[in-house]
Swiss-Prot record:
EC top class named in words: transferase
Enzyme nomenclature, EC number: 2.4.1.-
Chain sites annotated for binding UDP-alpha-D-glucose: 278, 327-329, 344-352, 366-369
Keywords: Acetylation, Glycosyltransferase, Transferase
Domain of life, per lineage: Eukaryota
Positions of modified residues (N-acetylmethionine): 1
InterPro entries linked: UDP_glucos_trans
UniProt similarity note: Belongs to the UDP-glycosyltransferase family.
Name of the protein: UDP-glycosyltransferase 87A2
Protein's gene: UGT87A2
The keyword Glycosyltransferase is assigned to this record: yes
Entry's Gene Ontology molecular function annotations: UDP-glycosyltransferase activity
GO cellular component, one term: cytoplasm
Native organism: Arabidopsis thaliana
Length: 455
């Protein structure tokens, strides 16, 4: 379909239902923004809880994206990490009925398709009852989804339970390059087992979706994406990176924020940007080691700390860095002063790091982040790990952190030069995917054709 043409009636009104979390809402919004910019007569109803509307309502967006809200029937975003299983259960059981009522109230025009996060377990069921096609958006890597869907292979190979330090290699999962057990989330063990059992219920609903969208670019994970053609009977499309790259070119007439002004004063490639994400956090003891190791490294840094900003500022007073509570991450990563990205390896951040051409220092915390770190370091070869030198250590010590930060930010070493060359190459691939005739735009048009022809 020519994007300049008006979309058919089957694709006039999209209802978007993201899973209520920052790492899920952002890519869903980026998808909707790309579509309304590409298809002039498309309208989107973007559904969030009342709490989330307070968080994102003021953010700029196209006029043809409108918010609708569900009541706050789930735990607050501010406390969901304290009982993650309870939060998932609340999303599964408390939001379906109010979403149905909202859906039935939308009639000008009536919804033509539902975009739902894969983790919104009831979306396919709701769409089926109303004969509205549902498109599933997977916001993590295609590789981790292939791992999840082939989890039975771990059991048959005797790898269901393992120690995080195990070196044994898994080489039998479609779409997954040979990977050590320690680089896989322990999905059958303890707390992770409980999380996986709840997630698996959502994966069982995938065959009922009209299609599956990935936030990645095909070129970044082609083996994993190709593996889905034999695993699923629905079409899959890689339409990423679903990051806000289009907004980088928007001119801002307001005064530049202080952190950008500070970056302008730093030498090229000298700043380590640090973000540990917006959901999980490390222990106080580990944070103390990070702070002291960073200070002793003598490296310039910009640290975004969502919560605990004042405490960090005090601990790092007199160092070569700046601590802020929020920043425009993609803009920071694309700034010439930034030479490295300390990341928790959430997939959105990983995609932004790749797009920016900045090497990544991987410090994963949980779940898909563990495998993302392996992909960054071993598959794409655009980063290093922060890890224990001794397997029995509970904490990564300040000395280890100091040394790896210095090594990572050394632009003159052969290792540093090769890592940065690879990061630049991967950036070109990522940017090429979203260029005018790139794979992601081609896939978006194919996806729209599929939806309109089968509706």
């Amino acid at each position: 379909m020519d994007p300049n043409e008006s979309p058919p009636n089957q694709f006039r009104h999209v209802v978007a239902m993201p899973y209520p979390g920052r790492g899920h809402i952002n890519p869903m919004m980026n998808l909707c923004k790309r579509l309304v910019r590409r298809y002039p007569n498309l309208h989107v109803t973007f559904v969030v809880t009342e709490e989330w509307l307070g968080f994102i309502g003021p953010d700029p967006k196209p006029d043809r994206i409108h918010f609708s809200t569900l009541p706050n029937l789930i735990p607050s975003e501010l406390v969901r990490a304290k009982d993650f299983i309870g939060f998932i259960d609340a999303v599964y059981t408390r939001l379906e009925e109010p979403f149905e009522k909202l859906l039935d109230s939308l009639n000008s025009p009536p919804p033509s398709v539902i975009f739902a996060d894969t983790y919104v377990i009831w979306a396919v069921r709701v769409g089926r009852k109303r004969n509205i096609p549902v498109v599933s958006l997977w916001t993590m890597s295609a590789t981790i989804l292939s791992f999840f869907l082939h989890s039975d292979l771990l059991i048959s190979h005797g790898h269901a339970l393992f120690e995080p330090s195990e070196e044994e290699v898994v080489d039998y999962v479609p779409g997954l390059s040979p990977t050590k057990l320690r680089d896989l989330p322990p999905i059958f063990d303890g707390y992770s087992d409980r999380v996986f059992k709840t997630a698996k219920l959502c994966f069982d609903e995938l065959p009922g979706a009209r299609s599956l969208l990935f936030t990645t670019a095909y070129e970044l994970e082609h083996k994993a994406i190709d593996a889905f053609t034999s695993k699923l009977d629905i079409p899959v499309y890689a339409i990423g990176p679903l990051i806000p790259f289009e907004e980088l070119s928007v001119q801002n007439d307001n005064k530049e924020p202080n952190y950008i002004q500070w970056l302008e004063e730093q030498p090229e490639g000298s700043v380590l940007y640090i973000s540990q994400g917006s959901f999980l956090s490390v222990s106080e003891a580990q944070m103390e080691e990070i702070v002291k190791g960073l200070r002793e490294s003598g490296v310039r840094f910009l640290w975004v700390a969502r919560g605990g900003e004042l405490k960090l500022k005090e601990a790092l007073e007199g160092s070569l860095g700046v601590v802020v509570s929020w920043c425009d991450q993609l803009r920071v990563l694309c700034h010439k002063a930034v030479g490295g990205f300390w990341t928790h390896c959430g997939f959105n951040s990983t995609l932004e790091g790749i797009y920016s051409g900045v090497p990544m220092l991987a410090f994963p915390l949980f779940w898909d982040q563990i495998l993302n770190a392996k992909m960054i370091v071993e598959d794409w070869r655009v980063g290093m790990r922060i890890e224990r030198t001794k397997k029995n250590e509970l904490l990564i010590g300040r000395e280890e952190i100091k040394e790896v930060v210095k090594r990572f930010m050394d632009r003159e070493s052969e290792e540093g030069k090769e890592m940065r060359r690879r990061a630049c190459d991967l950036s070109e691939i990522s940017r090429g995917a979203v260029a005018k005739s790139g794979s992601s735009n081609v896939n978006i048009d194919e996806f729209v054709r599929h939806i309109t022809n089968t509706n």
